[in-house]
Amino acid sequence: MFVGKLTQNHAQDMGNNMLKKNIFYFFFILFIFILDRVSKLWIISIFNSENNLEIKISSFINLNLIWNKGIAFGLFSYGEKFEYNLLTGLIIMIISIVFWMIIKTKGLEKYGFLMILGGALGNIFDRLYYSAVPDFIDIYYKNFHWFVFNVADIFITVGVLMLIINEITIKNHK
């Protein structure tokens, strides 16, 4: 009887810990999504009210609102509705795969996928709401400008880097 009770309590503790972790993961994703939304709403309001073409932040960062109908860095920007809808559908499928990967992974890899999902949800929201993603961070050096991006893109990029680092670390330990 005592062993059965101990096992039952252990199972309850494990269930409670898993619930706490899942709640944390949910709020982690929600934080990324909200941070991205707030930054985009802020930049849209500035550019709508000021009609500025560019705001200089420093000698290497500008704010410059660009409506991106493609994917990362403006790639695959299509003017046709069919191609845009096809691309949006593919992105939603990829988001579903990332969600599944979060369930299946742990550690650094899980946090990489959580960051990717948070950023991807921010960008897919914009694609569905605005039919484009507002990009606004312009990093440059002299006449060389990197692709204009947003906060969601930062989290997606950091998440991918975490996955790469995790993969390299695992391969080096084998």
Where are these regions (language model features)?
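Alpha-helical transmembrane bundles and membrane-interface segments of multipass inner-membrane proteins
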Residues: 2-174
